[in-house]
């Protein structure tokens, strides 16, 4: 009896080995690599009419999501009013913005009060300032008095490390749950960053953060206007599903903040598990979100960093590092 069990196990093992080798040979003949990823990919989407009005009443079946050109099944669908917000407000305090800081502080205060005065009780905001260095003036909180106190201490000096600010703000957001948003208030120019605009965008996409940019008091004469900085802000905003407001002069800053809050209250969360997605040597997966109604337009991030052919690919730290003199500094 014991010998018959050993023989049965032997022939079972041979059949298993033959099937495994056969499957391996078939896989080796396939030129394209596909993988079913167990990691949920989250996409925040904003939908508007052709006239620019936000639409927050669509159903799951009215969305289509494509990963590297392959349509995916939407596994998670939520209206964003139920999702907690973590908002990083990045205020440019370089020398070129000094004259506008008082108005920016007042408008930012109104933004914080409107943001945290309604919505999810777990919503929180943090205040960062940036010139040649980035300072965390106020960590994530719901304490409006603490935020207002820090806003009043802002003063302008030195250069502008805008890309470094976005990168480090994204790193602060990465471990947090729920929706993540970076709002950048600046005059659009970057003069001293160690990171590039592409590295800043990559950090935001890795953190699942949406970027909104508000350009304050741009020069109306194109000959002296920093259009390169404005284009970079628009590049980062559109790549994460956000918006860039141009220009923002006087009361238009308040209008921009109001528009941001309106969008945040009417967004959708779409989630999918990547399936049958062709992999290549680039970690970046191209995303496309569509709505079935031709009279509507959708904004969402244009991609995410996932698996590559042959494995997961390197860590973000393999491509981007923080140099010692650009470390984020906390306000004491």
Placement of each model-derived feature along the sequence:
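Bacterial N-terminal signal peptides that target proteins for export
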Residues: 2-20
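Hydrophobic h-region of N-terminal signal peptides that target proteins for export
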Residues: 19-28
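Scaffold/interface architecture of coatomer-like assemblies
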Residues: 28-332
């Amino acid at each position: 009896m014991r010998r018959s069990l050993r023989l049965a196990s032997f022939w079972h093992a041979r059949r298993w080995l033959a099937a495994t080798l056969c499957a391996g040979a078939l896989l080796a003949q396939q030129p394209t690599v596909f993988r079913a990823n167990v990691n949920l990919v989250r996409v925040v989407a904003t939908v508007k009419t052709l006239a620019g009005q936000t639409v927050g009443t669509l159903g799951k079946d009215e969305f289509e999501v494509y990963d590297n050109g392959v349509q995916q099944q939407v596994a998670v669908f939520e209206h964003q009013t139920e999702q907690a917000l973590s908002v990083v407000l990045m205020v440019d305090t370089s020398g070129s913005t000094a004259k506008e800081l008082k108005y920016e502080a007042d408008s930012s205060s109104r933004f914080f009060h409107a943001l945290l005065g309604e919505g999810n009780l777990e919503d929180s905001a943090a205040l960062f300032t940036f010139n040649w260095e980035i300072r965390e003036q106020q960590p994530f909180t719901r304490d409006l008095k603490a935020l207002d106190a820090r806003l009043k201490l802002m003063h302008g000096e030195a250069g502008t490390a805008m890309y470094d600010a976005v990168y480090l703000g994204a790193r602060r957001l990465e471990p947090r749950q729920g929706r993540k948003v970076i709002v950048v208030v600046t005059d659009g120019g970057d003069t001293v960053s160690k990171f590039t605009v592409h590295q800043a965008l990559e950090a935001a996409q890795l953190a699942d953060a949406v970027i909104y940019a508000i350009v304050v008091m741009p020069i109306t004469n194109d000959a002296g206007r920093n259009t390169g900085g404005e284009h970079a802000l628009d590049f980062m905003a559109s790549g994460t599903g956000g918006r860039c407001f141009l220009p923002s002069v006087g009361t238009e800053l308040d209008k921009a903040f109001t528009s941001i809050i309106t969008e945040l209250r009417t967004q959708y969360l779409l989630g999918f598990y990547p399936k049958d997605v062709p992999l290549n040597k680039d970690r970046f997966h191209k995303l496309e979100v569509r709505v079935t109604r031709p009279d509507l337009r959708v904004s969402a991030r244009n991609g995410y960093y996932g698996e590559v052919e042959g494995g997961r690919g390197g860590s973000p730290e393999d491509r981007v590092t923080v140099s010692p003199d650009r470390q984020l500094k906390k306000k004491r």
